[in-house]
Curated annotation (Swiss-Prot):
Name the UniProt record assigns to this protein: Serine-threonine kinase receptor-associated protein
Gene Ontology CC: SMN complex
One of the GO biological process terms: negative regulation of transforming growth factor beta receptor signaling pathway
GO molecular function terms attached to this record: RNA binding
Keyword Repeat: yes
Span of the signal peptide: none
Function noted in UniProt: The SMN complex catalyzes the assembly of small nuclear ribonucleoproteins (snRNPs), the building blocks of the spliceosome, and thereby plays an important role in the splicing of cellular pre-mRNAs. Most spliceosomal snRNPs contain a common set of Sm proteins SNRPB, SNRPD1, SNRPD2, SNRPD3, SNRPE, SNRPF and SNRPG that assemble in a heptameric protein ring on the Sm site of the small nuclear RNA to form the core snRNP (Sm core).
Claim: Repeat is one of the keywords in the record: yes
Highest classification ranks of the organism: Eukaryota, Amoebozoa, Evosea, Eumycetozoa, Dictyostelia
Summary of subunit composition and partner proteins: Part of the core SMN complex.
UniProt WD repeat ranges: 9-53, 54-93, 95-134, 138-178, 180-217, 219-258, 261-293
Gene3D superfamilies: YVTN repeat-like/Quinoprotein amine dehydrogenase (2.130.10.10)
Protein species of origin: Dictyostelium discoideum
SMART domains listed in its UniProt record: WD40
InterPro entries in UniProt: G-protein_beta_WD-40_rep, TIF_beta_prop-like, WD40/YVTN_repeat-like_dom_sf, WD40_repeat_CS, WD40_repeat_dom_sf, WD40_rpt
Length: 293
């Protein structure tokens, strides 16, 4: 069993984390936490770099833009905040009418999508953020996760407590619904842009990233909160209700290893961009960085 680097600093459950793309300075981790203080860390060793100060409520999601120059956080204080990762300053704050659970950058970094307990998706232009470009209704319960298609900045995907993944065409306003058996807990695209990885209930599903046809569905013996596919597509990690981070063979679904250490359910997990490590965040308030993949 591998021994993780334990990244302390948060005082309440860690709700989300993301790795940046690699650049000349390496990679970084941004974490969201119910303590309201998102943190920036070195992606190689987990060392704390800084804390983004300004939220007045729990922070539910955290994302980098493609160059790692900015970070985006969504909060229970009814705001989405854009941060400068170099100096930690708040660039702008986008007001909402209720708790915001998710926010993500478009591929070209010019727009963001947000969603939360209002059950409404909003699209904002970061050059003119005072009013949304679009407001999209259709979800019947809280939106927990939303992201942009890696192949088309006019396509947005969202999922949440209504047990449906919705694929929205922003040009026409039409949607396609992919039904799940349980609430959608996480959603990410693979590094090579071939797969969409989603979790719901005890299932991890791998979809074709262009046709959105389900290619593989693996049922696991615990409720899954998160999953991430290795950059070479050989294996995936999953975490959830049993406190452990599991590693599975992508082709067969067979379990390769179990990583124990968290003292609460695993809320989020991601592979590093080079695949040499993965990070997990938990209800126990810690981030653990697992090396040597």
């Amino acid at each position: 069993m591998r021994q993780p680097l334990i990244c302390s600093g948060h005082s309440r459950p860690v709700s989300d984390l993301s790795f940046s793309n690699e650049n000349s300075d390496g990679s970084f981790i941004v974490s969201a936490c119910l303590d309201g203080s998102p943190m920036l860390r070195n992606g190689e060793n987990g060392d704390w770099i800084g804390t983004f100060e300004g939220h007045k409520g729990a922070v539910w999601s955290s994302r980098f833009n493609s160059t790692a120059s900015q970070a985006l956080t969504a909060s229970a204080d009814y705001t989405v905040k854009l941060w400068d990762t170099l100096n930690g300053s708040e660039i702008l704050s986008i007001e909402h009418q209720s708790i915001v659970k998710t926010a993500d950058f478009s591929n070209n970094n010019s727009r963001v999508v947000t969603g939360g307990s209002e059950k409404i998706l909003r699209i904002f232009d970061l050059e003119r953020p005072n009013d949304p470009l679009l407001q999209i209704s259709g979800h019947t319960n809280t939106i927990k996760t939303a992201t942009w298609s890696v192949h088309n900045d006019d396509i947005v995907l969202s999922g949440g407590l209504d047990e449906v993944i919705r694929i929205w065409d922003l040009r026409s306003g039409t949607q396609v619904s992919l039904c799940a058996k349980s609430s959608i807990t996480s959603m990410e695209f693979s590094k090579d842009r071939r797969f969409l990885v989603t979790t719901a209930g005890n299932e991890v599903t791998f979809w074709d990233a262009q046709s959105f046809y389900p290619l593989k569905v693996y049922s696991l013996p615990f409720d899954v909160n998160c999953a991430s596919l290795h950059p070479d597509n050989s294996k995936f990690i999953a975490g959830g209700s049993d406190f452990w981070v599991h590693v599975y063979d992508f082709s067969t679904g067979n379990e390769i290893e179990v990583n124990k250490g968290h003292h609460g359910p695993v809320n989020c997990c991601r592979f590093s961009p080079d695949g040499a490590s993965f990070a997990s965040g938990s209800l126990d308030g810690t981030i653990r960085l697992w090396k040597g993949m």
